[in-house]
Amino acid sequence: MKRQSDPKKGALTGPSQRQLRAGELIRHALVEILREEELQDEALQNISVTVSEVRMSPDLKHAICFVEPLGAGLTGQDTTDIIKGLNRVSKFLRGRLGRSIDMKFTPDLKFIHDESFGTAAYMDKLFLDPRVQQDTRRLSDVVDDEDEA
């Protein structure tokens, strides 16, 4: 999502408070809809999905939903199929969403796989590496020595 620039400061700013509030409202509503509804897409049968973030466009007419399929044994292809399935039923989800939230416009939904869970798992694995732990111990010893001086 493109960040908005502030003409006064010339710097990039993040999403507005309104976008953040609308995104959280939609995220909560989507979680409930996905939990309660029996979606007809074959890729979504007996699948649990977590919605980690919803980013809204400045006009609140488009929403990018970051999701992570849950379950042991899911392959990358399974995840891709689930994301494609969610995008196929996005019009249905938009209709249900329109009935459960109070907004002037119900946004178009686009689902994207949330890579942050994989990144966090990789970082955890990396920090457990003995060589990295050895380096972090050395760094903390140097910082402790500087604090004493």
Swiss-Prot record:
GO MF: ribosomal small subunit binding
Q: Which UniProt keywords apply?
A: Cytoplasm, Ribosome biogenesis
Gene Ontology cellular component annotations, sorted alphabetically: cytosol
Task: Tell me which domain of life the UniProt entry assigns to the organism this sequence originates from.
Answer: Bacteria
Which compartments is it annotated to reside in?
Cytoplasm
Q: Name the cystine pairs.
A: none
Q: Which InterPro entries match?
A: KH_dom-like_a/b, RbfA, RbfA_dom_sf, Ribosome-bd_factorA_CS
| Chief localisation class | cytoplasm
One of its GO biological process terms is:
maturation of SSU-rRNA
Record keyword Nucleus present: no
Q: One short Pfam family name for this protein?
A: RBFA
Biological function: One of several proteins that assist in the late maturation steps of the functional core of the 30S ribosomal subunit. Associates with free 30S ribosomal subunits (but not with 30S subunits that are part of 70S ribosomes or polysomes). Required for efficient processing of 16S rRNA. May interact with the 5'-terminal helix region of 16S rRNA.
Matching entries from NCBIfam families are given as: PRK00521.2-5 (NF001802), rbfA (TIGR00082)
**Assembly and oligomerization:** Monomer. Binds 30S ribosomal subunits, but not 50S ribosomal subunits or 70S ribosomes.
Similarity section: Belongs to the RbfA family.
* Protein name in the entry: Ribosome-binding factor A
Q: Per the UniProt entry, what species is this protein from, by scientific name?
A: Caulobacter vibrioides (strain NA1000 / CB15N) (Caulobacter crescentus)
